[in-house]
Swiss-Prot record:
Its EC number is 7.1.2.2. Produces ATP from ADP in the presence of a proton gradient across the membrane. The catalytic sites are hosted primarily by the beta subunits. It is found in: Cell inner membrane. This is ATP synthase subunit beta 2. It catalyses: ATP + H2O + 4 H(+)(in) = ADP + phosphate + 5 H(+)(out). It comes from Chlorobaculum tepidum (strain ATCC 49652 / DSM 12025 / NBRC 103806 / TLS).
Amino acid sequence: MQEGKISQIIGPVVDVDFPEGQLPSILDALTVTRQDGSKLVLETQQHLGEERVRTIAMEGTDGLVRGMSAVNTGKPIQVPVGGEVLGRMLNVVGDPIDGKGPVPAKKTYSIHRAAPKFDELSTKTEMFETGIKVIDLLEPYSRGGKTGLFGGAGVGKTVLIMELINNIAKQQSGYSVFAGVGERTREGNDLWHEMMESGVIDKTALVFGQMNEPPGARARVALTGLSIAEYFREEEGRDVLLFIDNIFRFTQAGSEVSALLGRMPSAVGYQPTLSTEMGELQDRITSTKKGSVTSVQAIYVPADDLTDPAPATAFTHLDATTVLSRQIAELGIYPAVDPLDSTSRILDPNIVGDDHYNTAQAVKQILQRYKDLQDIIAILGMDELSDEDKLVVARARKVQRFLSQPFFVAEAFTGLAGKYVKLEDTIKGFKEIIDGRHDNLPEAAFYLVGTIEEAVAKAKTL
């Protein structure tokens, strides 16, 4: 074990001197034992010459002094993987933070791993059914694909993520990995308790590096979650869901340490290695012939500017986008997905079939027409519309309400049992509304129901 001495500490960046010929490799983990016996992990970032390396700390550097010993572990940060991490909450270096004692994992993985080779990748494009009508119909997720979840505060990003975890765990007995990157600790705490209550915790591993952590932890915790997910894909051949909340903070953490590492900033002060870092992370999220990692990434958009380098770099990797809208949340329609703003690469008749594609396009057309007519309605009222337009508005309002759905994880708020709607039922329901087969039903019948049969049954009780 090579041992070095700390020579300089600048916030989260620590320089360590090693004896000649014993330099650690780039990305190797070093451990420092503090006075109280706790261990601090440093990750090697640069060789500065003269037997000195520059490292980033994964925890606060309080209490470190020059001359302290740093031991080279000889390999990158290793985290526990396998069935033992399910139902547990870990930090960036794989230590448990749930107070339930050590994780008895038989195997560890490095957080830095090569992306799968070309010949290992699966080329078939498959739709991934979520049981959420608006997603399955208008912006279908692909298995092994990447989805961006764009939304401001309080429009339901976390509830949507919770519902996805719940549906995957119950319907497809799949595993989920949740990586909390630089978000509020309170939200992580809420998520943990909600998962315990809803019973999905046994099929989920949680990894957190929240806002209060130093940038080293926030820049690496997404990789920790990804390694745990990769184990289930490679060694157990599973289809895993990886949730990252929030991918913007991963970039933000990288930009915080970039200047301290002495790199010249690039556009808007971001790190010059922005697209490389994002690419290394995103390239590992993929389907192989063994299994798949499907990711849903919450993306914060600074100052609502989608051309900002951070969200713009993430955009290039996405297969589908789900945009949550405050205007729709204000109407009381949950999930508050904007049906006209959300997109998917696989909404293509060759992949999802003509029936699905045509129904989705018809839904978008009728909603767009309603949107165009809203100004006229606001100024002149409904009476000034032609009979044809009145019919369009009536059907569009039914479609809009039918896009809402009671969630399993929101039963406490809605008082309604959650619904998982199969794709064929979703397509059938919207097709019937658009064809005018339910023009005689009141629009309230379509609000917060699952299938079209439930809407018809609800209409009889109104």
